[in-house]
């Protein structure tokens, strides 16, 4: 009889852990974090630049929100790292699939406008970043288009520009980018991302280019986001490109071209005469 009472079911109160709701949330969050770290034992929680861009809200990007009717837009992205106090040189988006696409559909075109968004990951580093874009399609260095932009290393910035030259598929290795770091307070690598947005203007040969319209400018000093709050970067790329591409075709004056500024565009493209006048045989 005693054994029956001992093993019989009881209607008494069930004992539970008196953990509060907030404490339970903290426990669940800690457990989820441990699971994520254990799932990636090699990285120990470190993120690749693609993963970091996703966390920061920089990916994915779509041109669906960009209202541009006169131009066909092509996009590409490049990731690179550069040692502090060093110079890195690479070509602009030399991916053959990306570069070949506009040249396949539009045999004759020029780069009318492009936007470049430079995203620096080293938020607390001091020093300057100098970015040069050089078109080495010409044999004579005096004819090469060269643009130079200087900005603090820990800043994000966007640049719009226009090149007056025709491009061919063979020119894909002639658009060079040189990035240098000066006066940096770091010794390790500075990882960055460059997003290129090309505006393709379709033309027919022979057509003279309006070289007077060739200009490179920093369209807007971007806000100094707090890098400790990832939510601040929500739709960052979309907002930047929408302002850049949408406002570039209506803006007439560029106060950023003031040479007295410490940062910004410090060197403009040289005005290159595309169609030189023919000399008469009687001269």
From Swiss-Prot:
Please cite one Gene Ontology biological process associated with this protein. transport of virus in host, cell to cell
For this UniProt record, the keywords arranged alphabetically read as follows:
RNA-binding, Transport, Viral movement protein
Please indicate which superkingdom the organism of origin belongs to: Viruses
Question: Pfam families given for it?
Answer: Tenui_NS4
- Spell out the InterPro entries in the cross-references: Tenui_NS4 (IPR004980)
Q: Does the keyword Protein transport apply?
A: no
Its Gene Ontology molecular function terms? RNA binding
Q: What does this protein do?
A: Transports viral genome to neighboring plant cells directly through plasmosdesmata, without any budding. The movement protein allows efficient cell to cell propagation, by bypassing the host cell wall barrier.
Tell me its family.
Belongs to the tenuiviruses pc4 protein family.
Designated name of the protein: Movement protein
